[in-house]
């Protein structure tokens, strides 16, 4: 594993929006610090948290990243239409 993870980075997201407007993240990719493109399929959404003043939503999730199961937090900003990975556990789940 030569790649090093950074946090608070933009991600390209594939998500599903149901007829009620509920957004469910499914897969994403990001560029790590050495420039490698990392693709991630979300295994489980542990928690969904609406942010105050309708600015966005946070998702605590788990997935296999670099061959290890990791817990991480994704954030979607409604006004910017932007997804970010804002934190990731350095330890395997």
Predicted regions and their residues:
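Cysteine-centric segments in proteins
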Residues: 1-93
């Amino acid at each position: 594993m030569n790649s090093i993870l950074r946090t608070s980075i933009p991600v390209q997201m594939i998500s599903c929006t149901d007829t009620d407007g509920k957004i469910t993240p499914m897969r994403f990719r990001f560029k790590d610090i050495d420039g490698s493109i990392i693709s991630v399929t979300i295994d489980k959404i542990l928690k969904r948290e609406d942010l105050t003043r309708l600015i966005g939503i946070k998702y605590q999730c788990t997935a296999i990243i670099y061959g290890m199961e990791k817990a991480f937090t994704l954030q979607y900003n409604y006004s910017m239409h932007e997804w970010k990975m804002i934190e990731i556990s350095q330890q395997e789940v």
